[in-house]
Amino acid sequence: MVQKLSRRLFLSIGTAFTVVVGSQLLSSCGQSPDAPIADTPGEQQEINLYSSRHYNTDNELYAKFTAETGIKVNLIEGKADELLERIKSEGANSPADVLLTVDLARLWRAEEDGIFQPVQSEILETNVPEYLRSPDGMWFGFTKRARVIMYNKGKVKPEELSTYEELADPKWKGRVIIRSSSNEYNQSLVASLVVADGEESTLAWAKGFVSNFAREPQGNDTAQIEAVSSGEADLTLANTYYMGRLLESEDPAQKAIAENVGVFFPNQEGRGTHVNVSGVGVVKTAPNREGAVKFIEFLVSEPAQAFLAQNNYEYPVLAGVPLNKSVASFGEFKSDTTSLDKLGPALAPATKIMNEAGWK
């Protein structure tokens, strides 16, 4: 069972947390994170999940978790930054058990702000590759997405493409589009360049890359793919699952957009293609720590990984899980296995570089 709690309902949280959901009272916030979980007969366990992901497939997955464990999921949705600020403002009495969000940048900020507590779990350490999780067990990636070059098949040949760095070449002038520098996916990508190439080289790259823009940054990844498909530009950088959605759409027009666009994995002869994650961690003041850990372990289990791969067009973190057929059609690729935790300190210089280069 997934109980979605409205944003307005939580705005009145003060030093104590009491909220009625239907006929149930949630009043476990005073419990220590390490305290044992009550096992009163007939009393259903529950966790409060703060999530910035807004996919219907996720709700189905949470219902599967409840069916398997008996633990109800109270879902509180919001934008990532809003949820981070809410948890901080709620302080020691925060009802949040789990914070789930997209992108390294948000996970890093949450860890830096002291929102997470460490988790030791053999399941998590086995199922999640080391480079996709915090070395201290603060957060764990549970799905991957690759940030790839997507190109108009009629205007660009794949053999013309090679690396992220090469996109600063003047031959691409007026041919490139991308979303805003305020987007966390782009910030994490540039952070990966800072780690790989250094700040000075990345600044030079960013200036060249920006000079190749066909228009000012606007729209999300889908908007970039649509513009490339229509011929407004020749190529973009976008996350793979956006293309998966278009290819799997029941709308013929959406499929047609995708069919005009090719997917190219950059840097295959070197460090590999940049990958990012949706990630999750146990909140420091979690009333139900045990239930929170069970939830995260469930997310990286084989059935959950298969469900996410097939229905949300993401790459699983668990090895051996079959991909959605449309995602599999992109081909196999080499991932950049630089620890995402190492990219965290590079986010601030990456943002500065993007601003200095004029990336709006």
Swiss-Prot record:
Its main location: membrane. A lipid is attached at C29 (N-palmitoyl cysteine). It comes from the Bacteria. GO terms for molecular function: metal ion binding. One of its GO terms (biological process) is iron ion transport. One of its GO terms (cellular component) is plasma membrane-derived thylakoid membrane. This is Iron uptake protein A1.
